[in-house]
Structures are given as C-alpha cells and as structure tokens.
Amino acid sequence: MDPASGGYPRHVPHLSGPAAPAHVAAHRAPAARRPLVVASVPSGHVYVRHLAPEEDDGRVVRLPDPDPDTPQRPAGARWWPPVMLRPEWARDADFDLLHLHFGFDAVDPSTLRELTEVLRGRGKPFVLTVHDLRNPHHEDRALHDAQLDVLVPAADALVTLTTGAAAEIRRRWDREALVLPHPHVVPLATMEAAQERRSWARGDTFRVGLHVKSLRASMAPMRLLPTLVDTVAQLPGAVLQVNGHRDVLDPDGARRDESLAAYLHEQADAGRLELHVHDFLDDRALWAYLASLDVSVLPYRFGTHSGWLEACRGLGTA
C-alpha cells in the first residue's frame, strides 16, 4: 500500500510513454503526470475525505458522487443509491480506481459481481473498505453476507477499521486487510471548544443520554430502557435524557413505534427521564447535543461501531 496515495495500491495505472535515450531524457523537462482519478463510494463521507493528504498536491482527484436521478451532475446532498455501483457507469466512466466504502445495501449480489467483472475487464483496481461485517440496516444477515462473498474475494486491496475486523476477514475469506482506524468526525475546532467548555462548566448534574433516532434494524431501545431508567434513578445527581425523532415518537409519525412512545411518555410524566422529540439534527446541533452529555448510551444489538461513537470520543462524551 502507498500511504502517499491515501492507502491505495501502488500498481494503479498511470500514463507513461516509451523510455527515451539517456542523453535526450537528461535535457527533457519532466512530463506532467496525470493525476490518479479515484471513484469513491461515497466520495463525500468523512472517512473517505480523511484519506486525502492534508495538503492537496494534485496527485489524486476524487470524483464527486453523481446525482442518482441525473448521473451527469454531482449529487450534492443526495448520493444514494450510488450511481458508481451501476455496471454501466463503471463500463463508460473515466477513472483509474474504484474505492467502495459503503452504500451497497440494496444492490443485488449478481449486480455486484457484474460490477467487479467490468472493473477487472477494464483493468481498473478495486479497493474495498470492509466497513460492516454485519449490516446495521438488515434484520437478516444473509444478503449482506452474500454481498461480501462477492466483493471481498474480488477486491485488489482491502481496508477495515479495527484489528478485530481484520482477524474476522482473515478467518472468513483468508484475505489480509489494512487497518485504518476511523478518523475524527467532528471538526477539530469544535472538539477543542467542547473540551474547553467541559473544563469550566462541570456542574452537579450527571447527564446520561439515549438517542432513539429513526430506528435501524440493529437498534433495540426497549431491551435496555427499563434497566437504564432504574439505574440512572439510583445515581446521585444523574438525569436520563432521551432524544427521539418525530417520525418514531409523534402520533402521526411515519415510523411510529407505539410501545416505545407510550413507555417514554409514561416515564417522562413520572419524572424519571427528560424526553426531547425533534426532527433530524444537522451536524452543528448534533455536536452540541452530544457535548452536553456525560455519557451517551448506544441502543444497538449489532453493528456497534459507528460515526456516533467517534463523535462522542472527539467531544469527550463517554
């Protein structure tokens, strides 16, 4: 692997010409090297952005995510379903290497196989981040396992986030993965400001947070909430704050969870927790919310390593 190119293989093709005689080459100005064009899925994700060098030297160009409705245009905020995973896009697009970080949740394994065959046929290296060994959006793991059984053997190089994941990849597919831990997801200036506030704003309240956002298949808040409510109630000066999205907790929410909503309102009315119901938080509001907590409890059954965990780490929240 070549750290200077963001962890991608050295054997990525580049433009070159026939060797010139030594006496000519000595007097010839260095030819401009074509930048390495990387198609990353998704290109705007914080992990992918952190693969780039801090100082842009122009040696690597990362394509923007195409708009799913109009692939000729950059996607802006909406990148899913990813156009770059369509075999027809990979067959015609101008790029040197495809890096799949995540986003293949709904892609049939046969389509992924066709994609990898197109890449191999064009001589385009394929780098895969094994981001999830178990998909947090899937109740049943069969589809994700089948997708990985196509992608992992086909990849020219593998990246993963932890040594434990690398060991599992070695066990399941006999492949070695480069471990590149998840980078910070909160801007450095925001992290610094949060740490400074913590140093002088310590009060008598110990705030424990649980967030029941739009529920993934991997989330099971009711499995731990009764125990969490009882435990926090026994801690001197502790407050349990539960935040939830309107689509889960509002009476007309599109994904309302009736039993969860009823339990939370009952406990809030009894003074055993603070309940905050709101819409999706943008990054700034999310960082402020997490920084206000002493502990953030993750209600996951599987798929526990997430950007949420990394944000808490950066903001000093346990």
Task: Specify the residue positions occupied by each region the protein language model found.
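Short beta-strand->alpha-helix junction loop in the catalytic core
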Residues: P68, L180-Q195, S214, R246-V248
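Donor nucleotide-sugar binding/catalytic pocket of nucleotide-sugar-dependent glycosyltransferases
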Residues: P153-R170, D174-M191, G203, R207
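Nucleotide-activated donor-binding/catalytic signature segment of Leloir-type glycosyltransferases, i.e.
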Residues: R246, G253-A288, V295
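Acidic donor-binding loop of glycosyltransferase active sites
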Residues: A288-T304, G314-T317
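Conserved donor-binding/catalytic core segment of Leloir-type glycosyltransferases
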Residues: S199-M222, V229, L240-N243
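Membrane-proximal helix-turn-helix segments that form the acceptor-binding/catalytic region
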Residues: E114-P125, R141-A157
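Nucleotide-sugar donor-binding and catalytic loop/hinge architecture
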Residues: R28-A31, M191-G209, V232-G237
